[in-house]
Amino acid sequence: MNVYIPILVLAALAAAFAVVSVVIASLVGPSRFNRSKQAAYECGIEPASTGARTSIGPGAASGQRFPIKYYLTAMLFIVFDIEIVFLYPWAVSYDSLGTFALVEMAIFMLTVFVAYAYVWRRGGLTWD
């Protein structure tokens, strides 16, 4: 149990700092309210419930579909983000893992490369 005391102290200090920061900001900071500050923010798009027009395309109203290129870009980001999540711990502990882990990572990287090549050949990386 004595091993975890520094971690618990650090967690308590982090939580206390967060609470104190929020309390001080709410007491000292300006509190000018207006309608645009209270509205929901949906990635630069007007909220779907207002029926207002958006800036995604000419004449596009909220609730309509938007170009698939945004979806593809987000999915590619997630794929490569997850790749890094798996690649970093493997690289850190590579010395102790051996050849089997090298083969596993090579297969994983090959799979990601094939997916990348597929998206590239299908035109998912062009913004026309």
UniProtKB/Swiss-Prot annotation:
E.C. numbers: 7.1.1.-
- Transmembrane ranges, per UniProt, are 5-25, 72-92, 100-120
What GO cellular component entries does it have?
Answer: NADH dehydrogenase complex; plasma membrane
Question: Where, subcellularly, is it found?
Answer: Cell membrane
Tell me what reaction this enzyme catalyses. a quinone + NADH + 5 H(+)(in) = a quinol + NAD(+) + 4 H(+)(out)
InterPro entries linked: NAD(P)H_OxRDtase_bac/plastid, NADH_UbQ/plastoQ_OxRdtase_su3, NDAH_ubi_oxred_su3_sf
Q: Which UniProt keywords apply?
A: Cell membrane, Membrane, NAD, Quinone, Translocase, Transmembrane, Transmembrane helix, Transport
Q: Offer an example of a GO molecular function term for this protein.
A: NADH dehydrogenase (ubiquinone) activity
Tell me its family.
Belongs to the complex I subunit 3 family.
State the function annotated in the UniProt record. NDH-1 shuttles electrons from NADH, via FMN and iron-sulfur (Fe-S) centers, to quinones in the respiratory chain. The immediate electron acceptor for the enzyme in this species is believed to be a menaquinone. Couples the redox reaction to proton translocation (for every two electrons transferred, four hydrogen ions are translocated across the cytoplasmic membrane), and thus conserves the redox energy in a proton gradient.
Q: How does it assemble?
A: NDH-1 is composed of 14 different subunits. Subunits NuoA, H, J, K, L, M, N constitute the membrane sector of the complex.
The record's listing under NCBIfam families reads: PRK07928.1
- What this protein is called in its record is NADH-quinone oxidoreductase subunit A
Name the source organism: Mycobacterium bovis (strain ATCC BAA-935 / AF2122/97)
Protein encoded by which gene: nuoA
